[in-house]
Amino acid sequence: MSDTICAIATAIVPQQGSVGIVRLSGSEALALAKRVFRLRGKQAFESHRIHYGHFLDADGGILDECLVLYMQAPRSFTREDVVEFHCHGGIAVIQQILRRCVELGARLARPGEFTLRAFLNGRIDLTEAEAVAELVSARSPEAARLAVGGLAGKLAGEVRQLRSGCLDLLAELEARLDFEDDLPPLDTGAVRANIGQSLAHARRLMATSTRGELLRTGLKVAIVGRPNVGKSSLLNAWSRTDRAIVTDLPGTTRDVVESMLNVQGIPVQVLDTAGIREATDTVERIGIERSHAAAREADLVLLVIDRTEGWTCADSDIFAQVRERPVIVVVNKSDLEGPPVYTPSRGVLATVPTAAPVGDGIDALEGAILAALGQEAFSVADGDFAVNERQYEALVRAEVALVRVVETVEAALPIDFWTIDLRAAAHALGEVTGESVTEAVLERIFSKFCIGK
């Protein structure tokens, strides 16, 4: 990490922002800044102060009028000297500034390299590093709040406490291997109780993964049904937009229409599909095929029926095609009269009446979706956190090792066997926080970060 790295730290989007940031980190960051930035007046670079001036090109001409922020090591995110140029947001300006930094010896940063340096320099642990990426990619306020809990070190504190308990017991057992004659008899009941508490603790941490996965990856919901039952009206009412075209003509929707919604913090991708019937032309046939594909790929299917017509044979046919997925039946046009609605007694998670044009039943529909996920009271409080897939896998290995410890104790095997599995549990827990992690794992984790973070 002896070289100085640089990257654009702000998002590059088609709609150019008003401000762009180019970030440097490394021992030569300040020296480079002094070569390219002309401070206004008699200012001198001071740590943690914003300075105004001009960024210069190779000929001494002005590239941009901007601000510069210098953060002296170790009081920076990476614990190295860090310099940020806050310039105008046009991509041409930002790229010229970045190119000039490279010309003077800085290296383009790899994805996540700033955060990697923060980890390697002891500024943050691995759970906090991963929380940085989760905060950047959060798609709802609840997901962001969950990431902040991890960034604050809540998860790391829990795992370190758990690992410390394993190491304390391991130290005691290894001492007995060396000085057994000098110590009182070992209370195996206390050992089992100790391991039992550690197992319960690990399982509590593992239980947070479901909520975290929902907030990170979201849910895909397909709206299916016969033509003209109100699928597009339901999407428009739910999204509070005119996302889909609505007419009285059956078969208006010919393709899958997507909309992103937020259901109590859970990102939900809703797919409004073409009405399923015998196709009358090639275009409609392709649309219906895509409807079937959307239903197969969905996490949850909303089967919409028409209250004025009741449950029809065509509805039964569609249900038979989608019943392998979790299904909620939506009885639309419930404000109108119609025959009694008899839905299948098996294979349906819930039946929800709606009147899409006036928005009735949307709250009940969202409640049914949350209930289907086992999340009837979904909320994220300050300080909450959730383990990600990598952390969960490491906790599973710790759990397996701890279960083996209990089994070896109960089988009255020699203490040597206990220590093998205790050491494995401690190692797995160390992988969560980064205290025992390989370079390959680090590379895999940080390669998923955006460049400049």
Curated annotation (Swiss-Prot):
CDD domains, per database record: trmE, TrmE_N
Residues given in the record as K(+) binding sites: N228, T247, L249, T252
What are the binding positions for (6S)-5-formyl-5,6,7,8-tetrahydrofolate in this chain?
R23, E84, R123, K453
Any matching Pfam family: TrmE_N
Gene Ontology CC terms, in alphabetical order = cytoplasm; cytosol
**Major subcellular site:** cytoplasm
Localization per Swiss-Prot or TrEMBL:
Cytoplasm
What is the required cofactor set for this protein? K(+)
Q: Which PROSITE patterns match?
A: G_TRME
Q: What does the note under cofactor report? A: Binds 1 potassium ion per subunit.
Q: Where does GTP bind?
A: 228-233, 247-253, 272-275
Record-linked InterPro entries: G_TrmE, GTP-bd, GTP-bd_TrmE_N, GTPase_MnmE, MnmE_dom2, MnmE_helical, P-loop_NTPase, Small_GTP-bd
Its keywords, alphabetically, are: Cytoplasm, GTP-binding, Hydrolase, Magnesium, Metal-binding, Nucleotide-binding, Potassium, tRNA processing
Listed under GO biological process in this entry are: tRNA methylation; tRNA wobble uridine modification
Q: One GO MF term, please?
A: metal ion binding
Q: What is its EC number?
A: 3.6.-.-
Identify the residues that the record assigns to the TrmE-type G domain, covering every copy: 218-374
- Paired cysteines (S-S): none
Quick one: which residues bind Mg(2+)? S232, T253
Q: How does it assemble?
A: Homodimer. Heterotetramer of two MnmE and two MnmG subunits.
What this chain does, per the entry, is described as: Exhibits a very high intrinsic GTPase hydrolysis rate. Involved in the addition of a carboxymethylaminomethyl (cmnm) group at the wobble position (U34) of certain tRNAs, forming tRNA-cmnm(5)s(2)U34.
Which PANTHER family does the protein's record reference? TRNA MODIFICATION GTPASE GTPBP3, TRNA MODIFICATION GTPASE GTPBP3, MITOCHONDRIAL
Its family remark reads:
Belongs to the TRAFAC class TrmE-Era-EngA-EngB-Septin-like GTPase superfamily. TrmE GTPase family.
Protein's recorded name: tRNA modification GTPase MnmE
Per the record, the gene is: mnmE
